[in-house]
Amino acid sequence: MHEIILGYQGEMSLKGLNRNQFESAMMKILRYRLKTVGKFKVYCTQSTFYMEPEEEDVDMDLAFDRVSKVFGLASLSRAVVCGKDFDTICQTAEEYLGASLHGIRTFKVEARRSDKSYPMTSPELMRELGAYLLGKHNYLKVDVHNPQFKVIVEIRDYGAYIHGPKVPGEGGLPVGTSGRALNMLSGGIDSPVAAYRMAKRGLALDHIHFASPPYTSERAKLKVKALAQLTSIYTGSSNLFVVPYTKPQEYIRDNAPDVLFTVLMRRSMMRIANVIAKRQGCEALVTGESLAQVASQTVKALQCTDAAQDLPILRPLIGMDKTEIVETARHINTFETSIRPYEDCCTIFTPPHPKIRPELEEILEAEAAMPGLAALEAEAAENAERIRIRITDQVEFEG
């Protein structure tokens, strides 16, 4: 039997005249994800992406796992291809899916015909194939409303495709079709989730992290690298920029009002991120901020943060509560790494009672009293370490 993977379009199918661009981008991504598994022929027709192995002994379990994490597919299935003769369809369905019918009590056959020249109607095909399978498995009953298993037959131009229930995909749009942004990766729970959600909308991402040794450790840096690697499974390859932030942070601590420290630090980070983002051709910044979660994430504080630089700041978590964020972090397998107890620079020097409704005028006044900050920020941006993050299943962090 000739097994292939089918990927079904979702939102992409609504793109009208630009649809070909999205499909081309999607096929490029699928080929890249599959190239380490084996040689695959990837093509698109009738709103479906076909991933057909061209070698024997390809690990189809691994291939399916790889492409199931690609944004742009509403659902997927592993299918077997056969001729469109009805007897061949019956025999192939039994050979491919017969074992899946053992141990269940109810099933249903679904049929779709994009090849309208096929001599049987969809209801006829469902009825006759269902009768054939009942003859092979007389303990089964048909349940068209809530079956335990579905046998699906798709009659297409190039043959009959037989498979079980579709598996939900990640949805969204192919990464890179919406531009590029720089994600503020702190090491906590929120920022990897923010990267995941923006990549789902088609953004290619680089990451930026602020390190403040000796207050933050090398283990904290490795943790952030691990988070970038974990998100790469969904977001694709990226660059991680690690900014040496000790000097600017100490300068703000020593020269600014204690209650304004957090907002002043965030504005400083945004200015540095702005420089690196533009250098990389990024069109926006991404943060994991959620409204009112901490003192720096009130409306007033966010207003002050936004005013520090001129790129759009995308906040995909802004209306999510922590429970929703944690659920997504578990889904993308970043939660357990995020909660490892290593300090990040956002938590050091934090005042006990930060101002939650700062006014921009007082922030600008405080910055005017720190004339040496701009030079320290420029130095930090210039000395940022670039780490290339490639898509990997092997995360380089234990701790």
Language-model regions, residue ranges each:
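A conserved beta-strand->alpha-helix junction
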Residues: 228-254, 342-344
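Structural beta-sheet core signal
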Residues: 183, 207-209, 242, 287, ...
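Small/polar glycine-rich anion-binding or flexible loop at a beta-alpha turn
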Residues: 293, 341-349
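Active-site adenylate/phosphate-handling loop in enzymes that bind or generate adenylated species
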Residues: 128-133, 166, 171-178, 245, ...
